[in-house]
């Protein structure tokens, strides 16, 4: 006998099954890979994609939309392009390229997309901000007025840097550009400045060496290293500086001070040129695309000193929603971009672009470096256009004539090579100049506190070192500063606290120096 199903049973079974039915389908905007190669993919579809949006390719390879054309989208790939093939499906993520920001990033080595590569576990941050952001408008800025001490005598005395400034470090390869930047980062210890070191197109071993140096000198606790090495895809080298700027802006907008080093922007320009040519954008001078100036200007304009008025700061343009509740006034972001020149040619395309964007440049020369003057700064063509307003009064007072004295010394030195009979004044000037050059020399990774710099430069410019033989200047400096620290700490303390060199302090310093010079000379002769 066949079992019959009653109609009411059928309806109850259907009801049961329909009750568990999920009607929501996941909707994705997808496209198809038409062509792939050299880290570039052409994708058909994705008609609603935004420029700079992240795209998901198979095998978890991420990409970014750069060229939005009528019939296809030109994407750059952040992973291995050999895992992507023609006909693959590409998904939109509806997320613009962004980077995680926060205190958790300090002490870590990350990729330009914020993924840790130091083996210390994942990074827990609540806030992500877009890589690209418009620079603060004029109304939200304040003029640069606080010093950012580098700890290098030649820079802090003649090419002072202020918080919120953009100062270019330019020179040939192997002239100590990275060393100047690393010394500056080490010198920020205990000064409340958060540092970001962006390595673009450097060797992996060089980045590891930088990280080891920062750890050795205790600088890693307030520093983040963003690494896009030479072996990383060109798109990562292109976005790395923007990731550094975004992280620096987080500290700037929350009322703190940050320093970002871009090492170096020449390699970012090369990576951008590579992407642009592969995307078939028209080439310009030196085959760089027409917007390579805009590439660097929009990056470096993000370094700024923000107004102290918190109400005005809260209205800042392009502020990410996640940052709005945290905004405070008075923060700053200082940028130290690095540019590598070829055979000292500062009139090439990229160097001239960046010189015109920044607020001054520190020019390093290979012949000075090879002659033993380190840091190898050519003070003749190095300038700081806004740093003078940030220099402490004591330094301004003692180093006022330093640049002129050195310029005259260089000129006289060139002429003295032709003639042997020099009058007394010329000889005295040459002797003084040789001593000034000697006191500006400094070892690597030993930045000097500003009060000690003021003391030793005061001795040099006042002629108190004229009695010390040139070969003994470095030893004299070391022993004199050690003596000041132990026997006259009040002199250094007064300079550090007041930021000025009062007449009585100068008198004390002069007397202490005169006594020490005579005892030092006796010791040397003995």
Swiss-Prot record:
Keyword annotations: ATP synthesis, ATP-binding, Cell inner membrane, Cell membrane, CF(1), Hydrogen ion transport, Ion transport, Membrane, Nucleotide-binding, Translocase, Transport
**GO: which molecular function terms?**
ADP binding; ATP binding; proton-transporting ATP synthase activity, rotational mechanism
For this protein, what is the EC number?
Answer: 7.1.2.2
Subcellular compartments: Cell inner membrane
Q: What class of enzyme is it?
A: translocase
Q: Which GO terms describe its cellular component?
A: plasma membrane; proton-transporting ATP synthase complex
What catalytic activity does the UniProt entry give for this protein? ATP + H2O + 4 H(+)(in) = ADP + phosphate + 5 H(+)(out)
- Tell me the InterPro entries matching this sequence: ATP_synth_asu-like_sf (IPR023366), ATP_synth_asu_C (IPR000793), ATP_synth_asu_C_sf (IPR038376), ATP_synth_F1_a_nt-bd_dom (IPR033732), ATP_synth_F1_asu (IPR005294), ATPase_a/bsu_AS (IPR020003), ATPase_F1/V1/A1_a/bsu_N (IPR004100), ATPase_F1/V1/A1_a/bsu_N_sf (IPR036121)
Gene3D superfamilies according to UniProt: 2.40.30.20, ATP synthase alpha/beta chain, C-terminal domain (1.20.150.20), P-loop containing nucleotide triphosphate hydrolases (3.40.50.300)
Q: Which domain of life is it from?
A: Bacteria
Positions with a binding annotation for ATP: 171-178
Q: Where is this site: Required for activity?
A: 382
Q: Mainly resides where?
A: membrane
Q: What topology does it adopt in the membrane?
A: Peripheral membrane protein
Q: How does it assemble?
A: F-type ATPases have 2 components, CF(1) - the catalytic core - and CF(0) - the membrane proton channel. CF(1) has five subunits: alpha(3), beta(3), gamma(1), delta(1), epsilon(1). CF(0) has four main subunits: a, b, b' and c.
Physiological role: Produces ATP from ADP in the presence of a proton gradient across the membrane. The alpha chain is a regulatory subunit.
Family the entry assigns:
Belongs to the ATPase alpha/beta chains family.
Under which name does UniProt file this protein? ATP synthase subunit alpha
The gene for this chain is atpA
